[in-house]
């Protein structure tokens, strides 16, 4: 049974010692092996519940998305990964929670909504699974339900290079440049399910094409007086 985050005595934005330790190691590795560059992270709210939706290229994606942020990023993980007690402790320390793939896991949906409404930053891949060829897959319907129920800011993000670094056909990752771009929060208010899915699909594809073409978003404006 999953305990809703509202019952846990934790700071939604606090980076635990485990999180900080793992993040520093992963940042070093990502810089050395993947030349990781992250753009537009200022679009992600500093506090409060928010949903980050991204294309899904490889197992690297949840970690890659989290490395460019100043907040902890909560995410779903396959239930099989929680069978090993030590590894389960580690990924729970990194704000992961289990989901049964392909089973219409209502518990995972409820947990996602509870986390978002409880002030967490949550990552969801609306495609539902990793790409087979690097291209963006159709959006799954469940993400629209999550967005309509949670009523929190929705920040789009895209990743390139992660597929080349670790495609489904490889057992281990290889060196390849990876780029991440966060976009402006989407206005999905009063949209029905199909409109939400169409907006997400169009936004992610446009951002993905732009990033592959080398179109890097501008840096945020500097505060006055600096």
Roles of regions detected by a PLM:
Residues 36, 40, 76, 89, ...:
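Secondary-structure transition/capping residues
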Residues 2-17, 107-226:
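Non-catalytic C-terminal accessory region of glycerolipid acyltransferases
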Residues 37, 74, 179-181:
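Generic structural signal for residues positioned in beta-strands
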Residues 34, 71, 176-178:
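Residue-level signal for beta-strand positions within conserved beta-sheet cores that form or flank
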Residues 8-10, 14-17, 28-47, 221:
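N-terminal signal-anchor transmembrane helix
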Residues 1-8, 44, 66-67:
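A short, flexible N-terminal coil/short beta segment enriched in small residues
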Residues 24, 31-32, 39, 44-103, ...:
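Catalytic core of membrane glycerolipid acyltransferases/transacylases, capturing the structured
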């Amino acid at each position: 049974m999953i305990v809703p985050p509202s019952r846990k005595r934790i700071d939604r934005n606090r980076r635990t010692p485990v999180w900080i330790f793992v993040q520093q190691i992963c940042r070093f590795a990502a810089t050395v092996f993947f030349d990781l560059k992250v753009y537009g992270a200022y679009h992600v709210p500093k506090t409060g519940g928010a949903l980050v939706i991204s294309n899904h290229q490889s197992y690297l994606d949840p970690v890659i998305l989290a490395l460019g942020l100043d907040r902890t990023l909560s995410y779903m993980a396959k239930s099989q990964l929680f069978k090993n007690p030590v590894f389960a402790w580690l990924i729970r320390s990194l704000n992961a929670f289990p989901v049964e793939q392909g089973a219409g896991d209502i518990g995972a949906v409820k947990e996602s909504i509870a986390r978002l409404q409880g002030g967490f930053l949550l990552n969801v891949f609306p495609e539902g699974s990793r790409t087979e060829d690097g291209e963006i897959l159709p959006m799954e319907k469940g993400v629209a339900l999550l967005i309509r129920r949670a009523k929190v800011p929705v920040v789009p993000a895209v990743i390139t290079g992660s597929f080349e670094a670790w495609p489904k056909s490889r057992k281990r990752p290889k060196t390849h440049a990876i780029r991440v771009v966060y976009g402006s929060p989407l206005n999905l208010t009063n949209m029905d399910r199909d409109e939400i899915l169409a907006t997400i699909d169009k936004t992610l594809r446009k951002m993905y094409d732009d990033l592959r073409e080398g179109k890097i978003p501008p840096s945020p404006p500097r505060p006055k007086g600096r």
